[in-house]
Amino acid sequence: MEELKKIAVIGAGIMGTGIAEVCARGGYDVALVDISEEILQRAKERIRKSMERAVERGKMSKEEMEKALGRIKFTTNLEEAARDADLVIEAIPENMELKKQLFKRLDEICPERTIFATNTSSLMITDLASATKRPDRFIGMHWFNPAPVMKLIEVIRGALTSDDTFNFIVELSKKLGKVPVEAQDGPGFFTTRFIVAVLAEAIRLFEQGIAGIKEIDTMVKLGFNWPMGPFELADFVGLDTIYHVLEYVYNETGNPAYKPPLILRKLVLAGYLGDPRQKPGSRGGFYEYFKIPRER
């Protein structure tokens, strides 16, 4: 594995924040980038609270926590963060053009050696890599929420990703305590294609009156031993995220299993983007819209 000293994480939302925390706890210097100081301040508080919980559970010492926090630089300056990074992990919203614009800019800023990893959950890696002049050093590194807890990293090669780049990300994932598993490039890869199809079908069954939201969640949790039901999971991930992923996969594949349900579109248009604890500014998710008490 090439020497890795500095990682730039672009996007300080829930995923980017979690990724930055894991990398810092793994001993790497991290620059966490976003467009506003307010977002970065929230990220800083979230990381500290997460590490404090880890200390309480005996996962790390207080001294280790302070050292890890000291490895993270929070900045709105993309060029400053990325120009000497050995690895850039992108974790901005799931929008093809937005991501391509970012990678085109990063391609101009970063040295040739820098590897680009995208945390996209659905967009094709080969398509994103086409915005750069380094498709051999471009790869999908799909983390799961919450990043400090979830073990899986889905690793996706683009059509031109080199073996060296693939092996680098696999070894890094292991060093960070994760389990890397390879999936092939395609809309939604494996994990996202699988889970959004399940969520869409649960929503359609609710629309058809087969069972209520709470009842569906209870049956899935008790019958299949899932930690969250499909509506709880949808609210946790974000209804807007699920809608856009379904729309993308449906448009790319034509498979009706991925056609976004009408009620999902209505909620997103009305500002119900998911659980407000996970989606600041959201009116709520399925549970709030249909006035169902949440289990706390």
Label each residue range with its predicted role.
Residues 1-53, 57, 109:
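NAD(P)+-binding Rossmann beta1-loop-alpha1 motif at the extreme N-terminus of oxidoreductases
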Residues 28, 83, 146-155, 227-228, ...:
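Acidic/polar active-site rim loop that often engages polyanionic ligands
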